[in-house]
Amino acid sequence: MSIRLKVANTAKELDDVFKLRHEVFIQERGKFSSKDIDPLRIVDHFDTLPDVANVVAYEDNKAIAAMRINRDSQIGLPAEEYFDFSDIRSHLKQKYLDSKGQGPNIVSASMLAIHKDWRNKKNVIFSLFKTAAGVMYSWDATHVVAAISEETLSLYGRIGFEVIDKPMWSESVGDTLLPILAPFNKVFDWTFGSINTKVSHFWLDNFCSEFERLILSPGEVIFSQYEPARHAYAVDNGWVSISRRDPESNEMLLANLSKGALFGEVAIFNGESRDATATALMNTELIVIERSHMLDIIRQNPDKLDQLLGHFARRIRETDNLAMVLAFAPQTGRVEVALSRLWDSATPDRRKPKTRVAKVGPQQLAKTAQVRETEVRRVLEMKKAKGCLNYGDNVVRFLRPPKTGDFTEALKESPV
C-alpha cells in the first residue's frame, strides 16, 4: 500500500499529528513525565505560532510519522527550550552581516514521531525529512537546529547535522538530548542534490513548500488511463512505466521514467483526463504537486508563464527527438539511446563510485527501446565483452559511460 507525505493543513490532519505524538512518545516510549499532558494529544506553545508546519505521513488513512518545523521567532525555537544556542546565534549573525549584509534565517526541526511499525523503515523517515526540507527551502532557511534524542543521531548525521555540545538528560522529556546544527545548503543537497540538475528550477522555486511525496511498491498504479488529472509528478527514486491501451485493449509502452523525470503535468493544464496509465516498476518515491496549488501560483504570478512555456518547449523537443529515434534509428540505435538514458538515471555504486547501477534488466530495456529482447541482449553482450558494463536479468552495472553513435548524437540538437 502506498504512503503519502504532506504538510498537515486541515484540523483533522493536525489532530492526527498531535495524537500520533502522544501514541509514540508516551504510550510506546514512556517519555514526557509531566502530569499536565493531555490524555490523548501532545501540543505545546510552538504549535500555535504563525510560522509552523507539521509534516505527516499516512498509510491509507492512518498517520504513521510526523515532524514539526518552526521558523525563528521572537520567543526563540523549540530546541532552545533545552539548550543555549546564543553563542551559535551570535557567531552566525556576525558572519552573515559581514558577508551578506543581513542575518541568518534559522529554522528548527522537532517532535519527530514515528509509529513503532515504521521506525526501522528508513524510506519513510528520510521521505519525512525531505518533505520538511521543501518547507525550509520555501522559507529561505540558512541553518537548521534541533534538540534530538541521542539514539537518533545517526539519522540526522546522514543529512549533514553535527553535534555542537555535550548530551544532557532532560527530566521533563525522560530522555538524553543532543543539540545539533546543519547549514541548510547541506540539507538541500541531501534532499534535492541529484534531482536538482534534472528538474527545472521552475518547479523547485515555486512549488517546493507544496510538494507532497508518494512511496510506492512495485506494481502500484499511480494513475489510470481516462481518470481525471489531479496531480503532476516527478520521480525522486525508482522507475515508472507509462503505458496506453487502445480500444481493443492492446497495451503499448510509451516510456519508462527514472530519477528527475516529470510526468502528468500536461493533463493538469489542458483539463482533460489521463491518456495513459502510470505504474511503479520497483520501490519508487515520487514528488507530487497538486493541481490547485499549481494553478494558484500561475494565476497569482502571471510572469511565471514564461518559465512554464520554456518547460513545455523542452518537453516538445524531447518528444520530437524520441519520435526520430523510433521512426528512423535501427534497432541497435534504439538500444543505444535506451542505455544512454539508463546511464543518466543510474546511481553510483557505494563501494565503487565510478560504477553506476540501474535495477533494470534486458526485458524492461527492450520495452523501452521497442525492440526484441534478443536484440537488447546482443548489444549488452557486445558491451560486456568490451568492458563497458555487466548485466543480469534485473540489473545493469555501467563500468564507464556509454558511447552513443552519430545518429543519437545528432538528436541532441533539435531541428526547430
Residue ranges and their predicted role:
Residues M1-V43, L49-Y58, A63-I64, K198-W203, ...:
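Short amphipathic alpha-helix that is part of the acyltransferase structural core
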Residues L128, S273-D275, H293-G333:
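A small-molecule sensor/coupling module
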Residues N196-E248:
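Regulatory nucleotide-sensing modules
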Residues V56, D60-L92:
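Short, His- and charge-rich active-site/binding loops that engage polyanionic ligands
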Residues E248-F263:
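Short acidic-glycine-tyrosine-enriched beta hairpin
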Residues A79-V163, P167, G174-L181:
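Acyl-donor binding region in acyl/amide transferases
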Residues T142, A147-S149, G157-P183, V187, ...:
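Phosphate-/nucleic-acid-contacting segments
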Residues Q102-G103, F269-S292:
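Ligand-binding loop in jelly-roll beta-barrel domains
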